[in-house]
UniProtKB/Swiss-Prot annotation:
Feature: compositional bias, Acidic residues: 69-82
Name of the featured protein: Mitochondrial distribution and morphology protein 12
SMP-LTD domain ranges (all copies): 1-430
HAMAP family assigned to the protein according to its UniProt record, in alphabetical order: Mdm12
PANTHER family to which the protein is assigned, alphabetical: MITOCHONDRIAL DISTRIBUTION AND MORPHOLOGY PROTEIN 12
Species: Ajellomyces capsulatus (strain G186AR / H82 / ATCC MYA-2454 / RMSCC 2432)
Keywords: Endoplasmic reticulum, Lipid transport, Lipid-binding, Membrane, Mitochondrion, Mitochondrion outer membrane, Transport
Membrane topology label: Peripheral membrane protein
Function noted in UniProt: Component of the ERMES/MDM complex, which serves as a molecular tether to connect the endoplasmic reticulum (ER) and mitochondria. Components of this complex are involved in the control of mitochondrial shape and protein biogenesis, and function in nonvesicular lipid trafficking between the ER and mitochondria. MDM12 is required for the interaction of the ER-resident membrane protein MMM1 and the outer mitochondrial membrane-resident beta-barrel protein MDM10.
InterPro entries in UniProt: Mdm12 (IPR027532), SMP_LBD (IPR031468)
């Protein structure tokens, strides 16, 4: 089923101009965080326009929203702003209900406080031999995501009263993605947290203090320690090393490990809040085709190295006059919020089938496996024009102009894929 969009009404007026300015500012901030080549200086995004040609939308499926869309990470959006919204109870990283004193305090019952930041001393036998014991396998889904902060993932400058942005950190694709696992009916593979696992859900990067979660686990090191009989009696460190090993009665003495409780594990991750699912929540999969005249203007300087390095900078203006893409869009409606993102070709192929994934890399679709071939990017074509450095016959007078155009196009593709493709998504408050 096709959908007609009143593109002029949606992109014009004060609201359309405000949205265009926020997108321009967002792309500009992204370019300021990019390490520029030596011959380029001062890239500025000056304008953005939606154009006059609307995209073509075709509804392919309806389903329940993705679980990621129910994570409540907006501290400025109070419960009272939603009609009939029940009070949300905090849950821990495993999805269990957490009392208020547990959610706000790292202490245990009776006022006992667990020192989660107490450093662990290396066993004496390990210091003596210089060989580190084998550690147990680490679940990469539990690594503190703020060890790898993305300082370049702010919200839309100018306020987020009606627009939000979410970007989790992940490096898996194809069949290893959550969507691929759900479509096959299999649980997520190793390295992905489960449905109740902790996920980063902050729109702005925050400094994370050192925590027990951010350190490698030492829970399995007891099985790798050498036995008492295998150590030499003449070892001067023997008496100290035996403190971390089981004794003859099978009891272990670990004076350097802070006390823990199975009901209150050491975890500095703040409890996440999940919004309640309701029957009226829904999600739409749309095949989106666009070949319009959306425009983006950038200015930069090309540095000339003659007669000396960076002798002079020539201003250059680049105009992106249109682009073409074919992808599957996801639009979810959850109580006054609209979540929007695109699916990668792998996820779209898994969920919707190869015929709706936008798979053909070009115009040749006669081959049997052409629908399985994934394009290098969802953006199939980007048209760009430069206003300096061209002769009358159309050839470039400055060789670095072509390099600059290529660099800008690569960055535009990268920003689009990182910020608009699931598991990244945008949230609009309505």
């Amino acid at each position: 089923m096709s959908i007609d969009i009143d593109w002029e009404r949606a992109t014009s007026g004060p609201d359309g101009e405000l949205l265009a300015e926020r997108i321009r500012s967002f792309i500009h901030d992204k370019f300021q965080q990019i390490v520029l080549p030596r011959f380029i200086r001062s890239v500025q995004v000056t304008s953005f326009n939606f154009g006059t040609i609307p995209p073509e939308l075709e509804i392919r499926d309806l389903s329940d929203p993705f679980p990621d869309f129910y994570e409540d990470d907006d501290e400025n959006f109070s419960d009272s702003s939603e009609e009939g919204s029940p009070t949300r109870e905090p849950v821990d990283r495993y999805g269990n209900r957490v009392d208020s004193w547990q959610a706000n305090s790292p202490g245990g019952p009776g006022g006992q406080m667990y020192e989660s930041n107490q450093p662990l001393r290396m066993p004496a036998w390990e210091e003596h031999t210089g060989i580190s014991p084998l550690r147990g396998p680490m679940n990469f889904g539990d690594i503190n995501p703020y060890l790898f902060p993305r300082s370049g993932t702010p919200g839309i400058p100018g306020g987020t009263s009606n627009l939000g942005y979410y970007m989790p950190l992940s490096g898996l694709s194809s069949s290893q993605t959550p969507l691929g696992a759900v479509a096959r009916g299999n649980p997520f593979s190793g390295g992905w947290p489960d449905a109740h696992g902790a996920r980063p859900s902050r729109r702005r990067s925050e400094a994370e203090p050192d925590s027990a979660q951010s350190r490698p686990s030492t829970a399995n090191t007891g099985n790798t320690l050498p036995s008492r009989d295998s150590m030499s009696i003449s070892d001067p460190h023997h008496s100290h090393a035996s403190q971390g090993m089981p004794n003859n009665q099978g009891q272990a003495l670990e004076p350097n490990i802070p006390p823990t409780s199975p009901n209150h594990p050491l975890d500095d991750t703040p409890p996440r809040r999940m919004r309640e699912q309701k029957a009226e929540d829904f999600q739409v999969f749309c095949r989106t085709k666009y070949a319009g005249n959306i425009s983006l203007s950038l200015t930069a300087e090309i540095l000339l190295d003659y007669p000396m390095p960076s002798f002079v900078g020539l201003p250059l203006k680049l105009n992106i006059t249109g682009l073409t893409f074919d992808a599957v869009a996801v639009i979810a409606y959850i109580r006054r919020r609209i979540h929007f993102c695109f699916l990668s070709p792998e996820d779209a192929d898994t969920l919707m089938g190869p015929e709706t994934a936008g798979g053909g890399g070009g115009g040749d679709t006669s081959e049997p496996n052409s629908s399985r071939r994934k394009p290098s990017s969802l953006l199939r074509e980007i048209r760009v024009e430069s206003e300096i450095g061209r002769k009358e016959n159309g050839k470039q007078a400055l060789k670095n102009v072509g390099k600059l155009e290529k660099f800008v196009l690569e960055q535009v593709r990268r920003i689009f894929e990182e910020e608009f493709v699931y598991p990244s998504f945008w949230t609009f408050l309505i």
